[in-house]
Amino acid sequence: MLDREGFRPNVGIILLNARNEVFWGKRLREHSWQFPQGGIKYGETPMQAMYRELHEETGLHPEHVKIIGRTRDWLRYEVPDKFIKREVRGHYRGQKQIWFLLRMVGRDCDICLRATDHPEFDAWRWNEYWVPLDAVIEFKRDVYQLALTELSRFLRRPAQRAEKPRGPRVSRYPRVIGAQAQTLTIVDASVVCSEIEVEASTLDEMPPRVIVGK
């Protein structure tokens, strides 16, 4: 579904935890990471599309999140011709997105990447809000920057945990020493939510190269 100018309506989701860290999903069978996002179907409102995409890509339901804010208007980006399928060239220009900022009120183990039979991600992690954008594909960087900047006004100080700290926080980027394995939260068809070790070679770049397209 395209508008008169050739832009496809879309929603993007910035999901926060209590520490104001953001959810990043690893693209299925790729080394690319991104925020949850997807197209708005005919007849859907942006909010309806957001909740649908949230469940399809993270397994979360409306009761697991709280809407903190959204962008005031559409944020647009044009897609270079080399990334557009030949059959839609001349009609499709890019995407226009409404971005939602959500606060997760459920638990980490409520996240399930196999909520549908067409998963988008095969791993996920929390990262700092101001993730570097130099790894985002160039024509989409401005949209990420605009969304993060506009929605940052809704941020509050991270919630204070009542329980005793369990040790030092994980560093912003995983340390890679030779073939040493790193710990990454992964969800597959047989595990609802678990931590397993993966080879450091699968984490080529942190912050990850981000691909925003569906």
Curated annotation (Swiss-Prot):
<dbReference type="Pfam" id="PF00293">
    <property type="entry name" value="NUDIX"/>
</dbReference>
<dbReference type="InterPro" id="IPR022927">
    <property type="entry name" value="RppH"/>
</dbReference>
<feature type="domain" description="Nudix hydrolase">
    <location>
        <begin position="6"/>
        <end position="149"/>
    </location>
</feature>
<comment type="similarity">
    <text>Belongs to the Nudix hydrolase family. RppH subfamily.</text>
</comment>
<dbReference type="GO" id="GO:0016462">
    <property type="term" value="F:pyrophosphatase activity"/>
</dbReference>
<dbReference type="InterPro" id="IPR000086">
    <property type="entry name" value="NUDIX_hydrolase_dom"/>
</dbReference>
<dbReference type="InterPro" id="IPR020476">
    <property type="entry name" value="Nudix_hydrolase"/>
</dbReference>
<dbReference type="InterPro" id="IPR020084">
    <property type="entry name" value="NUDIX_hydrolase_CS"/>
</dbReference>
<protein>
    <recommendedName>
        <fullName>RNA pyrophosphohydrolase</fullName>
        <ecNumber>3.6.1.-</ecNumber>
    </recommendedName>
</protein>
<feature type="short sequence motif" description="Nudix box">
    <location>
        <begin position="38"/>
        <end position="59"/>
    </location>
</feature>
<dbReference type="InterPro" id="IPR015797">
    <property type="entry name" value="NUDIX_hydrolase-like_dom_sf"/>
</dbReference>
<keyword id="KW-0378">Hydrolase</keyword>
<comment type="function">
    <text>Accelerates the degradation of transcripts by removing pyrophosphate from the 5'-end of triphosphorylated RNA, leading to a more labile monophosphorylated state that can stimulate subsequent ribonuclease cleavage.</text>
</comment>
